[in-house]
């Protein structure tokens, strides 16, 4: 699925995303993550990077069903802040986390450029999310 320009702008605006994975017992596991948008021949993917094999990584490897919410910073004239809700299918890729985190740090936490990720960071993991459905409140629905 290809996201529209407004959804792309929100993702690139330096706002956090909330990622929901499923624990083995079916209960939700919620994490705040940084995501970047990457275009592939099959459509857009959201990519989150992790230096360690956190629970969200283990959960997504076991059950790839995930949901993300990205909340806008400005509600404009609306009564509710716009938000982008995405359901998708995750796949875990080993390696590549430092490069993605370096790019995301420039937008999300520029004061840490050159400091995060650390130079000796492990290769880590990428969560690559194929977008199955887009909802929320905003010009992307």
Task: Please provide the spans of the model-predicted regions.
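Short, basic/aromatic recognition patches
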Residues: 1-18
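Charged, gly/pro-rich active-site loop segments
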Residues: 2, 77-141
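Short coil-to-beta transition motif at edge beta-strands of beta-rich domains
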Residues: 13, 63-66
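Short beta-strand segments
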Residues: 15-52, 68-70, 82
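A short, aromatic/hydrophobic, helix- or strand-capping loop or linear motif
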Residues: 21-23, 69-73, 112-120
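Solvent-exposed residues in well-ordered beta-strands and their adjoining turns
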Residues: 38, 51, 71, 91-93, ...
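Short, solvent-exposed aromatic-acidic interface loops
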Residues: 50-55, 107-110
